[in-house]
Amino acid sequence: WIMGHMVNAIEQVDEFLNLGANAIEFDIDFDENGIAKYTHHGIPCDCGRLCTKSAVFTEYLDNVRQVTSPGDPKFRKELVLLALDLKLQRISSEKAYVAGVDVATKLLDHYWKRGWNGGRAYILLNIPLVEDYEFIKGFKDTLRKEGHEQYNAKVGINFTGNEDLDEIRKVLEKLGEDEHIWQADGITSCFPRGTDRLEKALEKRDTPGYKYISKVYAWTLVRSSIMRRSLRLNVDGVMSNYPDRVVGVLKEKEFADKFRLATYADNPWEKFTSI
């Protein structure tokens, strides 16, 4: 999965897909009551990027629904995963449950259309810190109460704050979640980062019987040398400001026979096993 980073304006969706992304990440900004208002990152953000691009969240969802709906004039078959970077650290943890309810409701109304011609992409809920775990409860409770638990099959969970992997597992156990779990590791592109935690996450992913990590990705990679380093460790995905650079690295002799771009036929919730 090549994840375009910080794709917050509607016009950026096609831009990042044209560069080779098959997944996009966008930031969800909440008001003080936990209501999702805009796709917006804000200052500071990655080096060399404009931090202020934004859209109304519901309008953004309406657009990506079209982009991921076969038969729609805007349809792009390559876009198979939407990563929602939930800026919950900007609001009180007490509002996390309400935020989960609100995001689920808006996805039902504007993305899935409650079963009527909705978008087909998989959804990854990127939650910054384990203390915000109530978001997941609010989200799942809403799908159940609204009679649309079928969408759980499309939804995954990812804690992105580089917290202790065992602490993350404990929270997932508490929630009763042991499927559809990704693990991110990374830092803003402005700073270097070692691979210690990334390697630990990959080791857990590859441990037989370990349920709490099915995919691992590294972020936010801009240098080809760091992309190569991550690929040599066998990550499942790379988040980048420059998807075209990732595409270029994947075409290199070292990687061309080992990796390919994920398509809609690839299940993002299953551990990859080579045939």
From Swiss-Prot:
List the GO terms this entry assigns under cellular component, sorted alphabetically.
extracellular region
> Which biological process terms from the Gene Ontology are attached to this UniProt entry?
killing of cells of another organism; lipid catabolic process
Q: Which family does it belong to?
A: Belongs to the arthropod phospholipase D family. Class II subfamily.
Principal place where this protein is found?
secreted
Q: Organism classification, top ranks? A: Eukaryota, Metazoa, Ecdysozoa, Arthropoda, Chelicerata
| SUPFAM superfamilies reported for this sequence | PLC-like phosphodiesterases
| Annotated catalytic residues | 5, 41
Q: What is this protein called?
A: Dermonecrotic toxin SpaSicTox-betaIIA2
Origin organism is: Sicarius patagonicus
This entry's Enzyme Commission designation comes to 4.6.1.-
